[in-house]
Every structure is written in C-alpha cells, then in structure tokens.
C-alpha cells in the first residue's frame, strides 16, 4: 500500500467511533439518496458466516411514515381497545420523530453451522455500520427497539415472514440540539487480558 509515512488512515475512523452517540431528537434534512445508497452498500461489509446475508432493511421516509404510524396505532388499540385519541395520536407521532427510518430485519436461515444468534448479530452489525456512517457524514441517528419491534400488527403490516425478526428502528436525520457531553467509559471495566494475573 503506497501512502505517506505520516498518514494514519485509521485515526479518523477511531475518533468517529469514540465520539458516536445517539440523537433522540432529529429533524430534516436526512441524507440525500446518493449518500444513503453509498452508506447502505458499504454497511453490508460485515462478518457473515457462510455468506447467508441474513438480513433485509426497509427504508421509510416522507408520507410513508404515516402508514407506519397507523401500524403503531393498531398496536396501541390491540393492547387497549379503549385507548383514547390522545394515546393513539402519541403512538402515531412516534413514526414522525425523524425524517427517515431504517427498519433492520433479521432474515433467519436454518443452517447447521450458523445459529440464529450469529445471524442476528450480523444484521445488527449492518445497522451499527449505518449509524456510524451517518454520524461521520454530519447527521445523527438513534436505534430504537421497544414493543413495536415485537408487535404483531407492526410485524404483519411491514410484511415480516415467520422466520424474520425486527432488530431495530434506526431513526435518521439532522440533530436538533448540539452534541451533548459524552459519558465517560472506562475501558478496563470491560476489557481484560487473559489469562488474568493474580
């Protein structure tokens, strides 16, 4: 590889990982289609045992978010048929919290060498890659799961099959507020060299 001896191509990426955070409040604009297409393609470069490609993703933006909101309302009414208008409207608005939503779906294949948890992790890696790339381009995202990820009305409305599972809703847009201070994390709380010395 021919590069300047002073160059450190990994530095910026490591800095981005260290600065990444979730942005629960997002607004327009979302990244344009050209940028999104590049991000989506690159995000697929993850560990994928036996090349099962155990994932698919739904991109929901614009007025289509209202249809997702309708599914959230169906879930609300299924749990409480007497839910009032205010409760239903609150559920509906949750689909409008960002200009773009990527629904990450694990598509499980029965394979003797690749358990479902490994396939789920691979799908999660793609979602995480998308979030990192979004942040590196000056936008923000937040990964949500919650009851809608396992809701029958939502899963059926989004066309999930019996071998599929929603792993997250990645909300994407422009952060509405400036960066919040990053909470300190101590590496040594989670990483230990083995064997441990007594």
Residue ranges and their predicted role:
Residues 2-9, 15-16, 166-198:
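C-terminal helix-cap and adjacent tail motif
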Residues 43, 102, 108-156:
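Small-aliphatic-rich amphipathic alpha-helix that forms the alpha element of a beta-alpha
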Residues 97-103:
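A structural motif
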Residues 1-97, 196-198:
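N-terminal amphipathic, basic helical "cap/leader" segment at the start of enzyme domains
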Residues 100, 108-112, 191-198:
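Helix-biased detector of long, well-ordered alpha-helical tracts
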Residues 154-167:
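Short, electropositive alpha-helical surface patch
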